[in-house]
């Protein structure tokens, strides 16, 4: 359980041993105390997932969000996902994942680029739409924010995608309308 939390973005029920979630159910508080004492972090345990959220001074391997242009884009994409859930357009399952058609997910990415692309770094701003969609999806999959299933043409959005969101400051948004 420790290794899964330390070396991945999150743990999800159904991916790995069910005993891991039973362990969290009974020993989660003690595990949280151990991790919080040894690292600057917090353990977030939910019904179908658990996350090891690092503090600003904690540097254990690669972290998300990084100080990169793609991290900014992914944070804004996570905000778009949250908007769709809050509006009722996308509905979470019992395990807090969201299953959406691949075309709907890709349309959301295109909409994000159209609305916010002026603020992206040059490489992403000038990138063709199809390449932008592929790169954003690949990066989201790398950080286990989503899982694409080409066979069923669906995207599973993991709960971690709703934990962090980003947007441009209001003064920037108003200036670029």
Task: Give the residues covered by each predicted segment.
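Non-catalytic recognition/regulatory regions in large multidomain proteins
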Residues: 1-107, 112-139, 143-144, 161-163, ...
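Short, cationic-aromatic polyanion-contact patches
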Residues: 152-176
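A glycine-biased, small/acidic residue-tolerant capping/turn segment at secondary-structure junctions
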Residues: 119-120, 151-153
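Short beta-strand "wing" residues that participate in macromolecule-binding interfaces
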Residues: 147-148
């Amino acid at each position: 359980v420790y290794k899964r939390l330390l070396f991945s973005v999150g743990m999800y029920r159904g991916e790995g041993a069910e005993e891991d979630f039973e362990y969290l159910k009974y020993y989660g508080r003690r595990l949280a105390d151990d991790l919080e004492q040894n690292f600057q972090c917090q353990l977030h345990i939910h019904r179908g997932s658990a996350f090891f959220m690092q503090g600003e001074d904690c540097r254990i391997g690669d972290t998300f969000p990084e100080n990169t242009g793609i991290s900014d884009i992914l944070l804004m994409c996570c905000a778009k996902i949250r908007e769709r859930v809050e509006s009722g357009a996308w509905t979470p399952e019992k395990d807090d994942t969201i299953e959406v058609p691949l075309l709907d997910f890709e349309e959301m990415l295109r909409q994000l680029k159209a609305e916010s692309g002026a603020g992206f770094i040059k490489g992403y701003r000038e990138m063709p739409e199809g390449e932008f969609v592929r790169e954003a999806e690949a990066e989201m999959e790398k950080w286990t924010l989503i899982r694409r299933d080409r066979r069923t043409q669906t995207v599973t959005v993991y709960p971690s995608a709703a934990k962090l969101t980003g947007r441009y400051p209001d003064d920037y948004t108003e200036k670029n309308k």
